[in-house]
Amino acid sequence: MNINATARSLLLTEFVSAFFLAMRYFFRPKPTINYPFEKNPISPRFRGEHALRRYPNGEERCIACKLCEAICPAQAITIEAGPRRNDGTRRTVRYDIDMVKCIYCGLCQEACPVDAIVEGPNFEFATETREELYYDKARLLANGDRWEREIAKSIELDAPYR
């Protein structure tokens, strides 16, 4: 047996070095958070629950161009456009998103020329049935109304990178 190995085993050098390593981390602040009660800040580029936005005058932004429907790789978006109005604009009659199919890639948000469809900051939208994850136009507009302040702030922060 080597004298060096014998000295190491008698003096328990590995044990002592491991003990000091553990003690160094023991007295540091904990990196974990108590999730339901504490939350980390969310990035401005976070992609969560979908929402349809409105203009400040209350009119919906969607112009029924169907670019989001065309670009969606999961084919989760279904849009039906209404007839043209007197001023030449169109609006959607039906705007549905199947959140079960959605892969949250953000391509719909990037394709939209008027920032109508966005992925908001909400990530806590668990449901008990699959049918509740089929969002219609009314629910998407309600999400947009509920999260408008946070959505506008994240779009403003992300503007230099678009």
From Swiss-Prot:
One of its GO terms (biological process) is aerobic respiration. This is NADH-quinone oxidoreductase subunit I 2. NDH-1 shuttles electrons from NADH, via FMN and iron-sulfur (Fe-S) centers, to quinones in the respiratory chain. The immediate electron acceptor for the enzyme in this species is believed to be ubiquinone. Couples the redox reaction to proton translocation (for every two electrons transferred, four hydrogen ions are translocated across the cytoplasmic membrane), and thus conserves the redox energy in a proton gradient. Binds 2 [4Fe-4S] clusters per subunit. It catalyses: a quinone + NADH + 5 H(+)(in) = a quinol + NAD(+) + 4 H(+)(out). Residues 52-82, 93-122 form the 4Fe-4S ferredoxin-type domain. InterPro entries: 4Fe4S_Fe-S-bd, 4Fe4S_Fe_S_CS, NADH_quinone_OxRdtase_chainI. It is a peripheral membrane protein. Belongs to the complex I 23 kDa subunit family. The keyword Translocase applies. Gene3D superfamilies: 3.30.70.3270.
